[in-house]
Amino acid sequence: GIEPDQGLRELPAVKSAQEKTVSFIQDNVLGHASADFQPVDEIKGIPSGRIEDTAVIDLIGTVQLENSGADVTAVALFKDTSDLKKGDLNYGNLFDIYKYPNVLYTVKVSGAEMKAYMEWAAACWNQWKEGDVSISFNPQKPGYLHDHFIGLNYEVNLSKPAGERIENVTFQGKPLTDDMTLTLCVNDYRYTGLKNEGIISGEKEWESSASVRDMLVAYLAEHDPLEPAVDHNWKITGVDLQKDNPDRATLIELVNTGRLESPYSQSLNLDTYSEVLGMVDNVKVSDLDKTGTAASFVGADGAPYFRMRDLAYTFNGSKNQFNVSWADGKVAITTSTAYDGELFPLPVRIPAAVQEQIPADITVSVDGTDITVPAILFDGHYYLT
């Protein structure tokens, strides 16, 4: 990226304009929220706003339907952490739940087109597999493509593959049939994308004169304080997250305490419970009388392979401490030196294909002397035995 010119920032005219802009966004109280609009995430890194209906999405949807007069509208949670917190609301708070200055369009769609659009949006989730204890997301489809629909009732069956998930869609209490016609409201960006992908065929019938942001400001002025409201018009089906299973609770605690990486793009699964637990407190440091955690697995040669940075972190303060870094295109180890890098969460799963790899020889610099050691590369880290 391009670094901002600090000298330009310090020019009196530029600095004054910046300060006035920030003050305008943050200091003008537009209204109030009577309570938080988003539920607390059960699992760190898994946004509740993308796995259940929430007041943020329903607020934006209500505003879009009221301004457009459409039958159905679509809303994405542009940022996973977007929320309206209880208390004063300013421009910055409203811009946080709607990042862009979009305007709205309406277009006529058939029931078949509507369901195709909903399937397109539902591809933002991964398919649920037996043993998965969380919902996860398709890393190829970012959150701003993950639309939720207001004006319809529907279910998303995540046990099915993408393209076959939308079920039991109703409009005004009746099943949505392929030959029905609806007026759909979307923002200008989404309309263009849907047209380009051939999901909808109709032409724009109406365009708003105000941006969605301006609509939200006006709505707040008329509904102060804002009350979080959720109509629960959609839900995820086809999954059994085993919420009463104590093993699930253990895995989630590891995520929430930072010892296990977030299962955002790959669900935790009870089938790998023993494997994951086998990496927790699996390193004993005798002279410190402590245990540590290192990502590890047993390789095809029967030897245990450990992520080197985890070992370096664990051995800090012991007689065997060492630092590990990347220098001159190779792993560099400095003995009798404290590790100065970060602690990485454990991987959710080390695939069998990685564990079955034949180790490759790599060059490691130890106190400036190059040696050759067998190693396996996974997710940007070397595992050594």
Q: What are these model-predicted stretches?
A:
Residues 1-28, 125-126:
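Active-site-adjacent helix-turn-beta-strand microarchitecture at beta-sheet edges
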Residues 24-53:
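Glycine-rich phosphate/diphosphate-binding loops and the adjacent beta-loop-alpha structural elements
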Residues 34, 39, 226-228, 319-323:
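Short secondary-structure junctions
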Residues 37-41, 45-48, 234-237, 331-335:
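Generic detector of short, aliphatic-rich beta-strand segments that form the cores of beta-sheets
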Residues 45-52, 102-105, 200-205, 294-301, ...:
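Second-shell loop/turn segments in exported
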Residues 54, 58-277:
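Feature captures C-terminal
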Residues 274-385:
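Primary recognition of N-terminal secretory signal peptides and signal-anchoring hydrophobic helices
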